[in-house]
């Protein structure tokens, strides 16, 4: 088993804290049209592409956010697992970025452009069933899937890619 450095542990803790703070701040943003919710903290789901410390950081941050906001057990468990699955998928795309000289607009490698897809997919697949279970509205799963997808595209895709563009400033992420 690989030993975890103090730097990795500190990075994971900082990401967890930032995810939690951003999630709590996002709870004050009213849902657009009553359906779409934008959890700004989801922009951080791009971070496993840059550091493996983000995987536990995001998972713990999501778990803490859900605990603090009083999420129901289904959301607490499956929402946190969706974040973990997305983080692992994003980290897996790191290899795609390392093994190709192909860069796309903004000078970012292909893997960085694809990095938002795992959390978008994980949340779009898992969360509609959680919302349907909690709301007791199973017939609304397609609507819930669409609303989660839109929120994830904006936060993971849009904001996450803006965050990824900061990779040109390695002092922000360090080197791992």
Please place each PLM-identified region on the residue numbering.
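Extracytosolic (periplasmic/ER-lumenal) interhelical loops and adjacent juxtamembrane/interface segments
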Residues: 58-62
